[in-house]
Design a protein with these regions (language model features):
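Conserved glycine(s) of the Walker
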Residues: 13-18
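Short hydrophobic/aromatic beta-strand immediately N-terminal to the Walker A/P-loop
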Residues: 8-12
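Conserved phosphate-donor/acceptor-positioning beta-strand/loop module used by diverse small-molecule
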Residues: 89, 104-125
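Switch I (effector-binding) loop of TRAFAC-class P-loop GTPase G-domains
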Residues: 29-45
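Conserved nucleotide-sensing/catalytic segment adjacent to the nucleotide-binding pocket
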Residues: 43-92
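A conserved segment at the C-terminal end of the G1
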Residues: 20-32
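Phosphate-binding P-loop
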Residues: 1-6
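NTP-dependent small-molecule kinase module
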Residues: 146-182
């Protein structure tokens, strides 16, 4: 199902909340080609793209350079823009990015992925090769909580099935659901 207007789905949440896991579930079974221009992205065909690279640890917009916002905002304003734009993480979760998307006609939905403090702690501790600076982590947590508070929808990061059901009710979820393969 191809949308009649451009759609954007962007997942935000604290490090370890389950954004990458949820995005992987939303795009499960969808074949893609990795592309580098205008920024690294996964091309699922039919003008459906996910910003960033595919990898098991820290995928998505975490793989983009800090200056990625300039080419991404130019892309969403162009005639070659994706019809469905997916993203997750805080790299591009800025007013500049969301405003550019909305100004270009995107129906943008920001979804907060939320879990309790104990779950976040357990998930972070399970990442034995990830030991972030505490000041950096506090900054990310603060930014993520603010983004979730302003999100259009908040889904549980500890109940993947329920989170997917809530997103599948959205116009962008309808498109992705039609493309997903079990």
């Amino acid at each position: 199902m191809s949308p009649t207007r451009p759609l954007m789905l962007y997942l935000v949440g604290q490090p370890g909340a389950g954004k990458s896991t949820l995005m992987a579930a939303l795009t499960a079974g969808m074949p893609f080609v990795e592309r580098k221009h205008p920024v690294a992205h996964l091309d699922y065909g039919d003008r459906v793209v996910q910003l960033g690279r595919h990898r098991s640890e820290f995928p998505g917009t975490d793989t983009l350079g800090m200056a990625a916002i300039t080419p991404v905002t130019g892309w969403v304003r162009s005639n070659e823009r994706p019809m469905v734009l997916l993203g997750e993480g805080d790299r591009l979760a800025t007013p500049k990015f969301f405003d550019a998307g909305r100004a270009a006609g995107y129906e943008a939905t920001v979804v907060g992925v939320a879990v309790d403090t104990m779950t976040i702690g357990a998930r972070r501790n399970a990442r034995t090769d990830w030991h972030p600076n505490e000041a950096w982590l506090r900054g990310r947590d603060t930014k993520s909580r603010k983004l979730c508070a302003a999100a259009d929808l908040v889904v549980p990061g500890d109940d993947l099935e329920r989170a997917m059901q809530e997103i599948d009710r959205l116009p962008v979820g309808d498109v992705l659901g039609g493309m997903r393969r079990p």
